[in-house]
Amino acid sequence: MTATIIDGKIISAELRARVAAEVTRIKADHGITPGLAVVLVGSDPASEVYVRSKHKQTQEAGMASFEHRLPADVPQAELLALIGQLNADPAVHGILVQLPLPKGLDSNAVIDAIDPAKDVDGLNPVNAGRLASGLFALTPCTPLGCIIMAKQVHASLEGMNAIVIGRSNLVGKPLVQLLLNENATVTIAHSRSRDLPALCRQADLVFAAVGRPEMVKGDWIKPGATVIDVGINRTPSPDGGKDKLVGDVAFAEAKDIAGAITPVPGGVGLMTVACLLVNTVRAASAIHGLPKPAV
């Protein structure tokens, strides 16, 4: 058996098209243009790439895009003052501070300062608490993308056995909550879990988010299971050429056992920015008291 490839390029393009249609409708019906503000501190090359991609895709969806660039040595008070201005700006419905921040800045204080209604990264403790309580919340983008990809394979996740490998605040913990909201039966595994391969072999859905190259081996996978690989790891090429990107799952082994699997690259990573656009439209609708959009 060779697994069906869950193509992030196709799914994210379809999602962005649906977002653009919702933006057009909201503009026409209510005269509102959803706006996303991205704050970049310093000049980390990887962050620069992400910010450019977000700016381009935001504009392509018909939304307003605001970029704020600050030097790496910006005082914490100045960064917090900018966030305060964005919180008060009616043209801004979503605020994203590109992480990680340079040394010397308190990321937790910055996240706490973002208005939860505009927290499109879903990291503010208020949104985390609302998600855990089953209330409407802006959800971290990568876990949201994982659920969308899993539901491309399974119309319903209800009753399925799922394992989430990794317990970060950014991916693992919110993903567990989203799976519970879908009525899946969830195991959360981590570095202290005993006999991780055996736990994986019981799962219909495997979500790998540990940041360890190809840790999940093919023989850990239950035949026919759906595998969502969140990992993006840069590893040296065996022939000494350019580094290659691999996931947390040993793809070459797993694809012959799984029923469906996401590739790396070309999988979950492409969904993250698309889900950021989803969150911005949802935030704009909620702020203006509009019904939840159809994305």
Curated annotation (Swiss-Prot):
Keyword line: Amino-acid biosynthesis, Histidine biosynthesis, Hydrolase, Methionine biosynthesis, Multifunctional enzyme, NADP, One-carbon metabolism, Oxidoreductase, Purine biosynthesis
InterPro entries named in the record: Aminoacid_DH-like_N_sf, NAD(P)-bd_dom_sf, THF_DH/CycHdrlase, THF_DH/CycHdrlase_cat_dom, THF_DH/CycHdrlase_CS, THF_DH/CycHdrlase_NAD-bd_dom
Disulfide-linked positions: none
PROSITE patterns (alphabetical): THF_DHG_CYH_1
EC number: 1.5.1.5, 3.5.4.9
Pathway: One-carbon metabolism; tetrahydrofolate interconversion
Listed GO biological process terms: L-histidine biosynthetic process; methionine biosynthetic process; purine nucleotide biosynthetic process; tetrahydrofolate interconversion
GO molecular function: methenyltetrahydrofolate cyclohydrolase activity; methylenetetrahydrofolate dehydrogenase (NADP+) activity
HAMAP family xrefs: THF_DHG_CYH (MF_01576)
Function: Catalyzes the oxidation of 5,10-methylenetetrahydrofolate to 5,10-methenyltetrahydrofolate and then the hydrolysis of 5,10-methenyltetrahydrofolate to 10-formyltetrahydrofolate.
Protein name: Bifunctional protein FolD
Taxonomic lineage of the native organism: Bacteria, Pseudomonadati, Pseudomonadota, Alphaproteobacteria, Hyphomicrobiales
